[in-house]
């Protein structure tokens, strides 16, 4: 996805607001993704009063991804993984993807995006994020459903993807049908119109 240690990668902890947690000072994302994350989780707090979201994973180097992949193969005994992407193919290597969990009273628990937390799934596109790996797109993405994994793609793209129920693979394929002469017109959730092409 990207070169090792890209300069746009920043510590989430150093740039976050007070309405969520981060698993450590080394957990990082691209600045643009952190800014959108702050806006989204601040709005989530206003809507629900919850401050128990924790970012447990963000940017990973190729070597870190290889380690996770190898650990998964060892744990499952399989030749390939449907739970962990190959190094060089992980969204985390882009610096635009993160994993959520819940953290309350010193205890971390799984995030599944249900109940009041469904607000994030319903509104993440307003902040440029998409729920990346859903059960209904498993055959297309090749990755099992991960209700905790979000990817920053930008507002107009996220709005289109959510409104039309397409995953990133489908969206990128669709965009190849559009050019500067004949762009895809996307009306964002706030009424702003974007012209998008491949």
Question: What is the meaning of each model-derived region?
Answer:
Residues 1-58, 62-198:
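Extracytoplasmic cell-surface/polysaccharide-interacting catalytic and binding patches
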């Amino acid at each position: 996805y990207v070169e090792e240690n890209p300069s746009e990668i920043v510590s989430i902890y150093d740039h976050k607001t007070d309405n969520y947690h981060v698993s450590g000072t080394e957990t990082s994302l691209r600045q643009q993704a952190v800014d959108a994350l702050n806006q989204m989780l601040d709005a989530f707090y206003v809507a629900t009063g919850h401050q128990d979201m924790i970012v447990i994973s963000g940017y990973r180097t190729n070597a870190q991804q290889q380690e996770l992949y190898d650990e998964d193969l060892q744990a499952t005994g399989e030749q390939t993984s449907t739970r962990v992407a190959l190094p060089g193919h992980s969204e985390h290597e882009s610096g635009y993807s993160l994993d959520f969990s819940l953290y309350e009273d010193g205890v971390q628990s799984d995030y599944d995006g249900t109940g009041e937390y469904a607000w994030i799934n319903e509104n993440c596109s307003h902040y440029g994020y998409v729920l990346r790996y859903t059960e209904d797109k498993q055959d297309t993405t090749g990755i099992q459903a991960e209700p905790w994994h979000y990817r920053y793609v930008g507002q107009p793209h996220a709005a289109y993807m959510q409104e039309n129920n397409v995953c990133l693979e489908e969206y990128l394929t669709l965009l190849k049908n559009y050019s500067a002469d004949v762009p895809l017109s996307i009306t964002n959730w706030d009424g702003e119109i974007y012209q998008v092409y491949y």
